[in-house]
């Protein structure tokens, strides 16, 4: 059931911290209770609960509110947690030796480094499975809303989403590529899960087709901005993950240079802001959150 929510014009720091705490609390409740011999469960919890930005679930919650949605809190929160589980699973797999071969993630050893490759793979599969189960069991959502949410998330994971993006990155990333080819890889790797998050928010809010279209465009530009920021910070040592992972890869930073990439990033953010404003008529909390986050990150790059 959806009802009209009060207008959330801005997002205070306390409100953002409370939302983040709510996400972590619900994730903790939804994930398996850690047992002494349940190594896969422990790896699932480590992958999903390690301190992180929780950008995707935060955006889902904030966008739903800015669309005028007030739902059963746990129901909307469960959708947000499902998205975070998918994101965590993708990071576990991306970090594997056969892929990016990363040793550090969120300031901690990667899951395969800590638990072994076999446990890491199983934990990622279990997180993906759990995500869909969480949507199916979410309170306060109609069966149709759940079905549509499952469809959005499954599309974001598969060959039109994360899988395709990772494959393109692995198979083409070390070869010369055009800017257009790099942008397409970035779209699959990053934009698609943002798009699923936004569309899930619009489903719960029963948003208009026009608003959904604006949110789709917002997601495309936001995903590109995030990936460009990731490329710009690749050489930094305080990101919580391995530095110089893009050495020898065809990225826009290597192709165009940092200054041109930062300008492109700001252009994507401006377009994203315009699309978001057109979609959300009940508040600007999402806008405030995105702007504050990127301002902080770009200040460290400049």
UniProtKB/Swiss-Prot annotation:
**EC no.?**
2.5.1.29
CDD domains per the UniProt record, alphabetical: Trans_IPPS_HT
Query: What biological processes does GO assign it?
Result: carotenoid biosynthetic process; geranylgeranyl diphosphate biosynthetic process
> Can you tell me which residues bind isopentenyl diphosphate?
53, 56, 87, 106
InterPro entries reported in the protein's UniProt record: Isoprenoid_synthase_dom_sf, Polyprenyl_synt, Polyprenyl_synt_CS
Catalytic reaction list: isopentenyl diphosphate + (2E,6E)-farnesyl diphosphate = (2E,6E,10E)-geranylgeranyl diphosphate + diphosphate
Query: Which of this chain's residues are annotated to bind (2E,6E)-farnesyl diphosphate?
Result: 105, 189-190, 227
What keywords appear on the UniProt entry? Carotenoid biosynthesis, Isoprene biosynthesis, Magnesium, Metal-binding, Transferase
- Positions contributing to Mg(2+) 1 binding: 94, 100
Could you confirm whether the keyword RNA-binding appears in this record?
Answer: no
Cofactor or coenzyme needed: Mg(2+)
Which region is the signal sequence? Answer: none
GO MF annotations for this entry? geranylgeranyl diphosphate synthase activity; metal ion binding
- Please report which protein family the annotation says this sequence is part of: Belongs to the FPP/GGPP synthase family.
Record's function text:
Catalyzes the condensation of farnesyl diphosphate (FPP) and isopentenyl diphosphate (IPP) to yield geranylgeranyl diphosphate (GGPP) needed for biosynthesis of carotenoids and diterpenes.
This protein is called what? Geranylgeranyl diphosphate synthase
Q: What organism does the record attribute this protein to?
A: Pantoea ananas (Erwinia uredovora)
Lineage, highest ranks first? Bacteria, Pseudomonadati, Pseudomonadota, Gammaproteobacteria, Enterobacterales
